[in-house]
């Protein structure tokens, strides 16, 4: 009957509206950090070379703002910092890393720095720094 037909049309329109709304919501990409360079090989390094400074850029490739929660390393000899903690979509930043190997013995060394964010895609991005520490 006519009332059943109207109910079907209303339900169809509601379903189509819901699907359209869902597809628009899903088209937004969550906040995500993309680091330009994640591995550094410094080669042969001497004790007397002092503190090593490394930097790399990153970009928020998502459609919403990303927040840097913390930057941690696997060793107190290595630290990292960014110039700010909040990056709107499409913006770039730089992480500056300092590595002081003066207390280490000659050996192959690998250090890791993690940038923790509020991205739902990945909890952190990791940067790896390698070198071979030589005696003076």
Predicted features along the sequence, with ranges:
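Bacterial N-terminal signal peptides
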Residues: 13-23
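Surface-exposed binding patches on compact interaction domains or structured appendages
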Residues: 63-92
């Amino acid at each position: 009957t006519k009332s059943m037909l109207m109910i079907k049309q209303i339900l169809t329109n509601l379903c189509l509206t819901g699907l359209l709304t869902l597809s628009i919501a899903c088209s937004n990409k969550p906040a995500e950090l993309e680091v330009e360079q994640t591995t550094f090989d410094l080669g042969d390094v001497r004790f007397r070379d002092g503190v090593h400074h490394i930097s790399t850029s990153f970009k928020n490739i998502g459609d919403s703002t990303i927040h840097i929660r913390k930057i941690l390393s696997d060793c107190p000899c290595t630290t990292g910092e960014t110039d700010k903690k909040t990056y709107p979509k499409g913006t770039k930043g730089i992480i500056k890393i300092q590595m002081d190997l003066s207390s280490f013995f000659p050996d192959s060394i690998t250090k890791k720095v993690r940038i923790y964010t509020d991205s739902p895609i990945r909890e952190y991005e990791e940067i790896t720094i390698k070198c071979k520490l030589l005696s003076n």
